[in-house]
């Protein structure tokens, strides 16, 4: 697989019209519930750096990106009225300081009535005439950009749209497969760089080069962690210095295709040693969790299944002693594995709606003692979730068990052995099916 053929443009073009019809149906229902006639979706505006004269990297409104593969286009408006062709007000600023967006082109243009404007003031004449009949979706920090529409992000409509976004169309799934293939290229390059003894910073650069992204185009900041840095869940640095001894490498990094993300984690041992054996065993554990994914399964139950498997592995590895339920109840598994099993994935890496019980906004809380579980819903066909168990030496969490039965269950000598390796996390992106799942990540690595 090469970067120039990760995207199947023909498949995307074939699926896109049905995707737009699905979005129309969702927005028809949302407008009816909100008692409105038109929805206006703002792509977003750049945000200025405090006390400076330049902007932060632009991040688009995910509702806009769900309609259009335009992730770098501020000041655009999508206007949809049921029964009518969607209107795209396409902002093409006349500017010699920055390169304006290219004229609209691609497989998507035939689905829209495209109106190119060169000044923000020209947007208004392409919007519905009665703002009281409109709802506006977007991050509006300048009232002028609302063009008189007062109903901004109404909960009645937003809850319905957010709940529905968890289920992916064929077009969205194809984008995510391509994002997985792109991400796999980066992960292969990163492993090669690790084996060659490169620094975290150098590995990060090799990853970006392999996926064809600038740092700002990544779906999230790459986690590139050598040795003990792998114990920091969202390790945010890329050290220029090489460690005196290379032991382990944890990389959590994704890629984008037309706004849709992959979110992939792998862990590698430098030597063929006991840690390498533990990583292999953990890979088996992760795949056993993937095998439990299917429509109708409560994701919170999967999360607790993971804790039971982690408890067994802790005993097998000599890191703890005790019965499975006792290790969970005493907080031992949470000390080694403090995060959730996974989350919804899509345009947003932590896609919206993971704790929604229905399309009215009912919240499903995570199980007691597991506050960081981002997905608590019953799984449905064509959702895409991450399955990302972890095992880490996080001293502050182990220290919190001092004076409790859980502290005595831990073999602290064995923990000292594992500490220099940091931790293990393995993460796949998995599509939910009626009788099982499609593993987008493993398929991408096999391509």
Predicted regions and their residues:
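Active-site neighborhoods and metal-handling regions in enzymes and metal-associated proteins
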Residues: 1-447
């Amino acid at each position: 697989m090469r970067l120039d053929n990760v995207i199947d443009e023909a498949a995307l073009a074939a699926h896109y019209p049905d995707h737009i019809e699905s979005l129309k149906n969702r927005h028809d229902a949302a407008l009816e519930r909100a008692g409105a006639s038109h929805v206006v979706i703002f792509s977003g505006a750049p945000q200025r750096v405090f006390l400076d004269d330049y902007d932060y990297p632009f991040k688009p409104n995910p509702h806009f990106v769900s309609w259009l593969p335009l992730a770098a286009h501020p000041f655009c408006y999508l206007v949809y009225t049921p029964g009518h062709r969607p209107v795209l007000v396409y902002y093409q600023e006349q500017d010699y300081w920055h390169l304006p967006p290219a004229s609209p082109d691609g497989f998507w243009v035939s689905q829209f009535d495209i109106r190119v404007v060169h000044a923000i003031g020209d947007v208004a004449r392409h919007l519905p005439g009665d703002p009281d009949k409109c709802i506006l979706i977007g991050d509006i920090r300048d009232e002028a950009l609302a063009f008189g529409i007062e109903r901004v992000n109404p909960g009645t409509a937003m809850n319905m749209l957010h709940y529905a976004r968890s289920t992916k169309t064929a077009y969205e799934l194809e984008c995510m497969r391509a994002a997985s293939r792109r991400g796999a290229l980066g992960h292969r390059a990163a492993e090669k760089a690790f084996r060659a003894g490169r620094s975290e910073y150098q590995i990060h650069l090799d990853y970006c080069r392999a996926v064809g992204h600038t740092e700002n185009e990544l779906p999230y900041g790459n986690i590139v962690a050598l040795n003990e840095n792998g114990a920091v869940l969202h390790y945010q640095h890329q050290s220029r210095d090489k460690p005196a001894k290379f032991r382990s490498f944890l990389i959590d990094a994704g890629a984008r295709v037309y706004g849709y993300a992959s979110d992939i984690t792998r862990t590698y041992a430098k030597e063929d040693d006991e840690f390498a054996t533990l990583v292999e065993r953990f890979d088996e554990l992760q795949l056993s969790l993937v095998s439990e994914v299917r429509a109708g399964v409560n994701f919170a139950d999967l999360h607790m299944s993971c804790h039971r498997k982690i408890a067994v592995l802790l005993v097998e590895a000599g890191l703890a002693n005790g019965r499975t339920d006792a290790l969970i109840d005493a907080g031992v598994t949470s000390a080694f594995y403090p995060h959730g099993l996974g989350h919804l994935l899509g345009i947003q890496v932590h896609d919206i709606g993971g704790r929604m019980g229905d399309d009215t906004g009912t919240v499903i809380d995570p199980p007691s003692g597991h506050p960081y579980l981002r997905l608590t819903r019953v799984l449905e066909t064509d959702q895409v979730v991450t399955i990302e168990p972890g095992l880490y030496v996080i001293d502050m969490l182990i220290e919190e068990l001092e004076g409790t039965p859980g502290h005595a269950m831990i073999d602290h000598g064995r923990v000292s052995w594992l500490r220099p390796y940091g931790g293990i996390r393995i993460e796949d992106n998995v599509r939910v099916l009626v009788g099982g799942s499609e593993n987008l990540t493993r398929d991408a690595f096999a391509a």
